[in-house]
């Protein structure tokens, strides 16, 4: 058996790298999908939250309209508090759905709708794609689009590509500092 001996300073550097990697993994597999369906004048906006059993605790799923900068449970159209299902294991992905229904769509229902999820423990904020709804007379047009503004990724705690980029850069910088410390010892 081969043993690797490290100087006291080197073990701290190795610990810093390990902590950065563990922190980068945080966030699990929680994600949001949204869709829309129409029957006559009725419009159903469906938000689906995919999560594992232990990730459900404290999650709130909600719909917002024309409010991309302040979409929160306090400013929502409708919300659902996700409950932990004791019947499921911690491995299987489970879905929770929130359907926002507009019984008879009118031009005042036109706008940009977004489904989001938020948790307090740990602080997680996930926002889904936008659904653009345009109601003119008897015609309703629905389009799904990606987030178009890059600043969405700067919202504190947001699990988005911007959030993961910040985490990756943090891990890279921490690793480089640790390697430099190892090199100077």
Swiss-Prot record:
Keywords: Adaptive immunity, Cell membrane, Disulfide bond, Glycoprotein, GPI-anchor, Immunity, Immunoglobulin domain, Innate immunity, Lipoprotein, Membrane, Receptor, Secreted, Signal. GO terms for molecular function: activating MHC class I receptor activity; kinase binding; MHC class I protein complex binding; MHC class Ib receptor activity; signaling receptor binding. Glycans are attached at residues 138, 156. One of its GO terms (cellular component) is plasma membrane. The keyword RNA-binding does not apply. This is CD160 antigen. Residues 1-27 form the signal peptide. GO terms for biological process: adaptive immune response; defense response to Gram-negative bacterium; innate immune response; mucosal immune response; negative regulation of adaptive immune memory response; negative regulation of angiogenesis; negative regulation of CD4-positive, alpha-beta T cell costimulation; negative regulation of T cell receptor signaling pathway. Homomultimer; disulfide-linked. Interacts with classical and non-classical MHC class I molecules. Interacts with TNFRSF14 (via cysteine-rich domain 1); this interaction is direct. Interacts with LCK and CD247/CD3 zeta chain. PROSITE patterns: IG_LIKE. SUPFAM superfamilies: Immunoglobulin. The keyword Cell membrane applies. Residues 161-185 form a propeptide. It comes from the Eukaryota. Expressed in resting and activated NK cell subsets (at protein level). Expressed in resting NKT cells (at protein level). Expressed in activated CD8+ T cells (at protein level). Highly expressed in intraepithelial lymphocyte (IEL) subsets, particularly in innate-like CD8A-positive IELs (at protein level). Disulfide bonds join 47-115, 64-71. Residues 28-136 form the Ig-like V-type domain. Disruption phenotype: No visible phenotype. InterPro entries: CD160 (IPR042385), Ig-like_dom (IPR007110), Ig-like_dom_sf (IPR036179), Ig-like_fold (IPR013783), Ig_sub (IPR003599), Ig_V-set (IPR013106).
